Structure formats: C-alpha cells, structure tokens
Amino acid sequence: MTTVVSRTFRSSPHRDALQTWDAIVELLTQGKDGTARSELRAVTGVAASLIADQAPKSAPIVATCDGPRTRIYCLFDEDAIDGDDANEEVLGFEPLKGDWGVSLPCPKEQLGWVQSALKKHSSRIIARDLSQGIATQAQADAGQALSLDLGGFLKS
C-alpha cells in the first residue's frame, strides 16, 4: 500500500499562480537544483495556467516517486486569504526520489493543448482530466490480473 501525504497551498489572491507554482516547486525539489527542478521550471507557464483556472482546488497535483505519494491542493479566494486550511510545511521525505512523476489536473476541454505543451518539456510531467482519479499500481495490477476465459465458462 502506498503512503499518501497531502499539502494545501494558498493561491489567489494571497499569491498569484506563478508564485504558487514556484512554492510547489520549492516543496517538491526541497530547494535543490537538478534535473527535477529544471523540468518543473520548464513547465511553469502551463502549470500556472492550470492553477489560475483553479484546477487544483478539488483535484490534486500528484507527485509520485520511489517513496510516498504527495497530493497538492490549492486554496483560492477567501479560503486563500484566511489560510486556516493551508499546510505548506516541508515534507519529511524526498518527494521526487528515484523514478518520479508529476500529474497535473486539467479541465477536459484544455487537455489536448496542455498535454502537448508538457510533452515538449518533460516525459515525467503529465496532465490528466481533473474529473478522473489517479490509478495506483495496485489498481492497474488488479485490473490486469482478472481475465475471463469465456469459452471455458460457457462450456461449463
């Protein structure tokens, strides 16, 4: 079973979408320079656009790695000003350790251009329809493990 950690960032109007993405990049990279930071910075415009559209309000940005999964939500409007539900604390593990990936929630009508734009900069950063959840490896394995021999079933 995968451990999941959640963080919630204050966005607009507390900080703009670019500043919100910068804060998320700082959390995920723990302030360290490297390939992960470069790839996350390369998609700043696209990620900020999704944050400005309030995509991560109810559907999280999800970072996966060889360790725990990190879900990142954003607060907007009065919730962002108030900040009571915010949790921007540093993580107690390296959120992009080993084989990492980041999935950004995206409105369905923007999915095509967003996926195309992200692909130009990174194969590790993808977009998904914000109305769809994130499949875990256990779910994928379970789906593949179930198969029905229809011929054998009908003969019995």
Curated annotation (Swiss-Prot):
Question: Keyword annotations for this protein?
Answer: Antiviral defense
Q: What protein name is recorded for this chain?
A: CD-NTase-associated protein 8
Q: What is known of its domains?
A: Does not seem to be able to assume a closed conformation, does not bind closure peptide. In the Cap7:Cap8 complex only Cap7 binds a closure peptide.
What organism is listed for this UniProt entry?
Pseudomonas aeruginosa
Keyword Secreted on entry: no
Any Gene Ontology biological process: defense response to virus
Function, as annotated, reads: CBASS (cyclic oligonucleotide-based antiphage signaling system) provides immunity against bacteriophage. The CD-NTase protein synthesizes cyclic nucleotides in response to infection; these serve as specific second messenger signals. The signals activate a diverse range of effectors, leading to bacterial cell death and thus abortive phage infection. A type III-C(AAA) CBASS system.
Q: Which family does it belong to?
A: Belongs to the bacterial HORMA family. HORMA3 subfamily.
Under the subunit heading, UniProt states:
Interacts with Cap7 (also called HORMA2) and CdnC; forms CdnD:Cap7:Cap8 (also called CdnD:HORMA2:HORMA3) complexes with stoichiometries of 1:1:1 and 2:1:1.
List the cysteine pairs that form cystine.
none
Tell me yes or no: is Transferase among this UniProt entry's keywords.
no
The signal peptide here is none
